[in-house]
């Protein structure tokens, strides 16, 4: 069995009585009935040659798939470095976005239409690999045991 890392201090995971898995995240909320989960996956891939994406997907019998992911830059010197481009373009917008929505730009899913638009996909970005690993552990435990869980990132 894979060794489990300690969950970050800004996360909490506890059983609930609802037979649902619930995620309360800084950028939104997600809930699914446990009987509707058909598969759970955790995987990593390289995006545009310079970002490592680590992703947890939860597939359901409904019409949508949910993706939770964490981004890590591979190199700071690449001319395609999306992280630097986003930081440069968004420096003046961060404060206005947070004031208007209550969400930091760093917590928001970043898309390039139409390349990263996924029909019927709900997406959440997490800010650390530890948060993503804790989320995977929570949803997998709920699905495996049939007991609802509530996962929170503060």
Q: Can you say where each PLM-predicted feature lies in the sequence?
A:
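Eukaryotic intrinsically disordered, low-complexity regulatory linkers and tails enriched in Ser/Thr/Pro
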Residues: 1-154
């Amino acid at each position: 069995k894979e060794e489990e890392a300690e969950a970050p201090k800004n996360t909490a995971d506890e059983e609930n009585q609802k037979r649902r898995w619930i995620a309360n995240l800084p950028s939104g909320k997600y809930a699914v009935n446990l009987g509707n989960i058909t598969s759970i996956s955790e995987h990593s891939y390289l995006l545009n040659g310079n970002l490592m994406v680590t992703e947890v997907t939860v597939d359901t019998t409904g019409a949508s798939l949910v993706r939770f992911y964490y981004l890590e830059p591979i190199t700071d010197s690449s001319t395609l470095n999306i992280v630097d481009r986003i930081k440069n373009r968004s420096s003046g917008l961060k404060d206005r976005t947070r004031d208007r929505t209550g969400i930091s730009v760093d917590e928001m899913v970043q898309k390039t239409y139409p390349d990263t638009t996924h029909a019927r996909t709900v997406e959440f970005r997490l800010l650390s690999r530890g948060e993503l690993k804790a989320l995977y552990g929570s949803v997998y435990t709920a699905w495996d045991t049939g007991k609802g869980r509530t996962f929170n990132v503060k």
